[in-house]
Amino acid sequence: MSEPRTGHYLMGKLGVYEVGQFLGQGAFGKVAKCSKLGSNECFAIKIVDDMEAGVDEAKAMGLIKSLDPDANNLLKFYESFKHQDYMCLVYEMLDQSLESFMRKNSFRPTHLCGIRAIAQQLLVALNALKSIQVFHGDIKLDNIMMVNQDSTPYKIKLIDFGLAMDSWDMELGTTFQIVPFRAPEVSLGLPLGVSADMWAIGLVLASLYFGRLPFTYDEEYDTLRCVVQWLGLPEEKLLNRGLFSTDFFTCDEDYSQPGWRMNSPSEYSKITGEAVRRLHNIPGLEDMKNIHKNIFELFDHDDHQTTEKVEEEGLHGPEAAPDQTGKRNQATSTSRKNSCKKNNNYNRNPSPQSRRLQTSSNQSGRGRRSFSVC
């Protein structure tokens, strides 16, 4: 069957749509701006070429539709239908993604008032999803849209629920999220929850604050090296439980101070067979903060402290939650005693080869997920 093109018509349940300009392309399909015949309405229609993935997303949106999308800053979903071999999902038309907004502004740091507004809206969205036990799984700059930056500045909505899953269905060791936004618990193979979405939100806010992605690397090891430099080693109890901890860390039991340490680049390459880039002059967290302060000197010290606190809470710990942003998980291990104790229920590291196969099939953070609707 031929792929839908500009000028083609799509027969939905709620009307007939004429395909206009294509706005973007993802792992499973394209998004087109479409006009509804007989009206002046425009919609964003996601045309998915993987039928199973399209059906999964439609099921997820059916559940999310029970929430008030405007009050909870979630993309409004209208209908889904099949067109030949494609699944079509009809969404409201929005303005631009945060990534496009940053690009248009030459990646200059965003004012704190804008960051604060975006943070509040994202936490409302995440809390709404948590209330129905849904995990987004792909929060990044491209998946946060501004509604209309000219008429309603910094009003945003969370979009793209193609990877959304029921929190009860998340399997231990599942790999998702693109690497620059991937939470440490995903890389380490720890039990998953809303904290992974919280981590991604922290990185979105940090990107707006700094005018650049904090972690720009495509390999998990490189990203984790930066995380450790900024926040210190993960807690020993987390490293003890991680399915993939020994890909990235080694537990030294024979030294005078036994405990976990990060593998050197050569050790990591030997374990996984993956090359590691040489990282030079990784900016520290304080250096990155000063970039923003030097640009916006008119904002007072309290504004910066408040924003930095929210960002840091988003970047800490599996216990972080959207309705408990004041509760921080301690990222740095405080004791190295008995740090190499293993929990046999969790420390089942598969071979590096099997992990690489899982990760390589998911480089874009995309993967087919089951989504049960009760």
Segments predicted by a language model, with ranges:
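Activation segment signature within eukaryotic-like protein kinase domains
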Residues: 118-119
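C-terminal lobe substrate-recognition/regulatory segment of protein kinase catalytic domains
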Residues: 235-317
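A conserved loop-to-beta-strand element in the N-lobe of protein kinase catalytic cores
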Residues: 83-92, 99-100
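Conserved HxN/HPN-centered segment at the entrance to the catalytic loop
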Residues: 68-79
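Catalytic-loop of the protein kinase fold
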Residues: 130-148
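Conserved end of the kinase activation segment
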Residues: 185-196
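Protein kinase glycine-rich loop
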Residues: 19-27, 31
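Activation segment/activation loop of eukaryotic-type protein kinase catalytic domains
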Residues: 142-179
